[in-house]
Regions:
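Conserved core of the PLP fold type I
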Residues: 60-197, 201, 207-225, 296, ...
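A non-catalytic, amphipathic alpha-helix used as a structural packing/dimerization or gating element
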Residues: 72, 256-259, 290-302, 380, ...
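PLP-dependent enzyme catalytic core of the Aspartate aminotransferase-like
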Residues: 345, 359-394
């Protein structure tokens, strides 16, 4: 009989990925995914960049490359991190990964032994939880409110908990809630982190997708001790199919991530990196991000307007200033998984929120995505969802 490693008991398929299989039919009004709008992918421009790379550097593009990543792309990433996040870095402090999801996997392997403690926001990104589970840690959820992680609660946990090896956060337009940390909390967080000297994984896939309000500084830009490991990605600002993300960290930490890259995949795709780099040199990434931002701004507005009109009391929802998601809290007696089945019968899909709490509970919550559906379908789908909620109120 085949015997598997004990860590496999910790792993299960992503509930979101499983749900996406059910919602693949074209007649489903799906708020379930976290995918960019495919109609915004710069297909023609990418074809030009691809042809240019193959004509000018074809053999290099099809060959193995360095573990760290294509040098020109790492320079471009460093330049953008300075321009957009006020993070002063250079290409030697950047490792290109196969999506930021690989950066999450490496983070677990670099820092965690079985039984170590990971602190994260409550709720938090399901993909990160699943990546960390392979290393068999204990999860402690830090309470949050509309301003992000509650710092007094973080202090209490750190003062009374042993073996805290890592803190994972999404300060900008968090997945799944859409919330953004305010400036005071960012400064307070870094003050606490500097005192306890615990590594922080700052996951920032949505930071450039701000629709309104002031840009907040990245935690990495406030880092004076080299404790913040910053994860970025091209998936939300260009195209996820290239599977290109990056890690920005100080020398000692980044060296460990390099070892993980060598062991896992040797490197990220050479041709994908070179085509992305060429596209950035040939075209205007800022203009492209503005196009994405404007599209999502309109879709978010339509979703929030429809929720405000149709969602019955005592239900509540978040009003994100950017990103891809809104978060709904139902009455405590209502189970979002039961609601999900009733909505699927009406051809409407969403993600039940309990999946985003690693220690369980909170089954009266759900996540809604607005990036991938035209405005008129958002109105129809949200109206049907709210109608179904109303039918199940006590």
């Amino acid at each position: 009989m085949v015997q598997f490693a004990s860590r496999m008991e910790q792993l299960k398929g992503s509930e979101i990925r499983e749900l996406l299989k059910l919602t693949a039919q074209p007649d489903i009004l799906s708020f379930a995914g976290g995918m960019p709008a495919p109609e915004l992918f710069p297909v023609e421009q990418m074809m030009e960049a691809s042809i240019a790379v193959l004509k000018e550097h074809g053999r290099e593009a099809l060959q193995y490359s360095t573990t760290e990543g294509f040098p020109r792309l790492r320079e471009q990433i460093a330049e953008r991190m300075l321009a957009k996040n006020n993070i002063h870095t250079d290409k030697d402090h950047i490792l290109v990964t196969s999506g930021s999801q690989q950066g999450l996997d490496f983070s677990a392997r670099v820092f965690l032994n079985p039984g170590d403690v990971v602190l994260l926001e409550s709720p938090s990104y399901l993909g990160a939880v699943n990546a960390f589970k392979a290393c068999e840690p204990k999860f402690i959820e830090v309470p949050t409110d509309d301003g992000g992680m509650i710092m007094d609660e973080l202090e209490k946990i750190l003062a009374t908990t042993e073996r805290v090896k890592m803190i994972y956060v999404i300060p900008d337009f968090q997945n799944p809630t859409g919330r953004t940390w305010d400036l005071d909390r960012r400064h307070k967080f870094m003050e606490i982190i500097n005192r306890y000297e615990i590594p922080v994984i700052e996951d920032n896939p949505y930071g450039e997708l701000r629709f309104e309000g002031e840009y907040m500084p990245a935690l990495k830009s406030l880092d004076t001790k080299g404790l913040v490991i910053y994860l970025g990605t091209f998936s939300k600002i260009l195209a996820p199919g290239y599977r290109l993300g990056w890690v920005c960290a100080e020398d000692e930490i980044l060296a460990k991530y390099n070892f993980m890259e060598q062991a896992a995949s040797l490197q990220a795709s050479t041709i994908g990196q070179m085509e992305t780099s060429k596209w950035i040199d040939m075209f205007d990434l800022d203009a492209h991000v503005n196009t994405i931002r404007e599209c999502y701004r309109k879709r978010r507005a339509v979703m929030l307007e429809t929720l405000a009109k149709e969602l019955p009391e005592p239900c509540t929802f978040t009003r994100p200033d950017g990103g891809l998601f809104a978060w709904v809290v139902l009455p405590e007696y209502m189970d979002a998984k039961d609601l999900q089945m009733k909505c699927l019968a009406k051809k409407v899909a969403f993600v039940p929120g309990g999946s985003f709490f690693p220690n369980g509970g909170h089954d009266n919550t759900l996540r809604l995505n607005y990036s991938c559906m035209p405005e008129e379908k958002i109105v129809k789908g949200i109206t049907l969802l709210c109608q179904t909620i109303r039918e199940n109120l006590r």
